[in-house]
Amino acid sequence: MSFEWPWQYNFPPFFTLQPNVDTRQKQLAAWCSLVLSYCRHRKLYTLDVLEAQESPVFNNKKIERKLSVEAIQVVFEELRKKGNLEWLDKNKSRCLIMWRRPEEWGKLIYQWVSKNGMVNSVFTLYELANGDDTEKEEFHGLEDWMLLRSLQALQTDGKAEIITMDDGKGVKFF
């Protein structure tokens, strides 16, 4: 399945941050939506700012336009404010991208556990994210850091407990 680009993607001014405040807000909202949709489609969880400039999401070769590194930083900062991005370093060169927040992943995981009658069951993190039983689930292949945060959110809600096992971490659902 190929990614469907929004109409703005082929509109050259989209690749230049607009000076008008209202226009810029709409533009940033569109960029945030595009970045999250693209990362979701490609199942990307980490981004490098310099590499991002060359990626298709910020570089439309068809119209020969790309967003500047400074503008990418502005988009990323907007995503951070919304809770969809976390910087991995002080230089703000690499980040975690959360096209779905940990609480949302936790909810999806718990729905699957409940739907399949697996409450009071124990899983290894590997089984949960990479097991045969979860192959058709959206959380299949979820990176460990996000899986752990999702389970921590469930633990906070009293729906799960993260446990340490001989071969790593596991989780019990309630």
UniProtKB/Swiss-Prot annotation:
GO BP term (any one): protein transport to vacuole involved in ubiquitin-dependent protein catabolic process via the multivesicular body sorting pathway
Coiled coil, from the record: none
Example of a GO cellular component annotation carried by this entry: ESCRT II complex
Location relative to the cell: Cytoplasm
Molecular function GO labels: protein homodimerization activity; structural molecule activity
Disulfide bonds: none
Pfam families, alphabetized: ESCRT-II
Keywords from the UniProt entry: Cytoplasm, Protein transport, Transport
Tree of life domain: Eukaryota
UniProt xrefs under PANTHER family: VACUOLAR PROTEIN SORTING-ASSOCIATED PROTEIN VPS25 (PTHR13149), VACUOLAR PROTEIN-SORTING-ASSOCIATED PROTEIN 25 (PTHR13149:SF0)
UniProt family annotation: Belongs to the VPS25 family.
Subunit structure: Component of the endosomal sorting complex required for transport II (ESCRT-II), composed of SNF8, VPS36 and 2 copies of VPS25.
Biological role stated in the UniProt entry: Component of the ESCRT-II complex (endosomal sorting complex required for transport II), which is required for multivesicular body (MVB) formation and sorting of endosomal cargo proteins into MVBs. The MVB pathway mediates delivery of transmembrane proteins into the lumen of the lysosome for degradation. The ESCRT-II complex is probably involved in the recruitment of the ESCRT-III complex.
Name this polypeptide is given: Vacuolar protein-sorting-associated protein 25
Gene that encodes the chain: vps25
